[in-house]
Structures are given as C-alpha cells and as structure tokens.
C-alpha cells in the first residue's frame, strides 16, 4: 500500500462469512510507512504524506471493489503512523482523509472510548493525542466499546511501543 520509509509496506486481508446470517465481512490490516521524510529545495527535512494518503486511497478502492454496493461489513486496522489530530507534524487529517470519507473511526464513534493513547514510545508519561496512530476504521457495523489495552499486568511495564487497540462491534 504505497511505501517510502522503512521500505515496502503490505496489507493482509481476509473475507469472512458469518455463519448465522450469511453476511460477508472484509478485514484489512496494514502498517503505514513511518516518517516518510524528503528534503525541500533548501535541504530541510519535510514530511512526505503522499505514501500514507496513497495507501488510504488504495484501501478504500479495494474495499469498494470487494463490497460492490453490497451490505458487507468492512474493517481497516493497523498502525497508520499518523493521528487524526496531529496537524502539521505528519498531516494525519490529509493522510487519513480517504478512509474518513468512506468509513468511520471506532475510537471516535464507539459508544464507549477509554480515552487512552495507543502509542507510548516506551515513555510512561507520554500522553499526546498525536500518539493515537493505531486505528480501527469500519463500515457496515456499529462500534460499541473501544479499548486501548494498556494494563500493566503482563510482567513488564511496556509490551511494545504501541498498546493494542480493540473494539467490540455489532454487525
């Protein structure tokens, strides 16, 4: 799905069928490029958001092609390396715009959101909203409870520099 930094990025997906109803569910998981920096004419580093935006466009295009106007539920999850609110730093609003126009954000639309930040950078005091770079987008379902799995009962304080995110849905 459109790459720059840290080399080629991929997307895995699966088509599922709910036995009880016969309804189709598509699930996509990806990891967008990290800090795709380029240099401007004066040699200053600037962020190139186009690889992330292109990845969002590809995901939406693939989703639309698979659903083809049907009633399938679609989920896109992953470390998208930008937040909806990060403004100029990584320009998440522009990078994620194709997804936001086609789908909903589980973090923003779930009936319950725990308010926790998903990225921690191995820093116990990290609490910037721009750290919400791990996303669940959806279409054709109803988001119930969005949880960032940040408990400290794993035997170590940090299980990763990102906490897993989960959401319960009604199809």
Q: Residue ranges of each PLM-predicted region?
A:
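Active-site regions of metal-assisted phosphoester/phosphodiester hydrolases
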Residues: 1-171
């Amino acid at each position: 799905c459109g790459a720059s930094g840290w080399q080629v990025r991929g997307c895995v997906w699966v088509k599922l069928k709910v036995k009880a109803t016969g309804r189709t569910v598509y699930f996509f998981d990806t990891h967008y490029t990290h800090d795709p920096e380029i240099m401007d004419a004066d040699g200053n580093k600037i962020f190139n958001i186009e690889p992330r935006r292109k990845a969002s466009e590809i995901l939406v295009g693939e989703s639309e092609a698979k659903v083809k106007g049907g009633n399938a539920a679609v989920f896109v999850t992953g470390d998208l390396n930008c937040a909806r609110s990060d403004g100029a730093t990584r320009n998440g609003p522009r990078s994620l715009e194709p997804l936001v126009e086609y789908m909903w954000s589980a973090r923003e639309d779930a009936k319950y959101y725990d308010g926790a930040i998903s990225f921690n950078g191995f820093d116990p005091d990290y609490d910037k909203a721009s750290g919400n770079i791990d996303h669940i987008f959806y279409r054709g379902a109803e988001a119930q409870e969005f949880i960032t799995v940040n408990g400290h009962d794993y035997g170590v304080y940090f299980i990763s520099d990102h906490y897993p995110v989960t959401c319960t849905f009604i199809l």
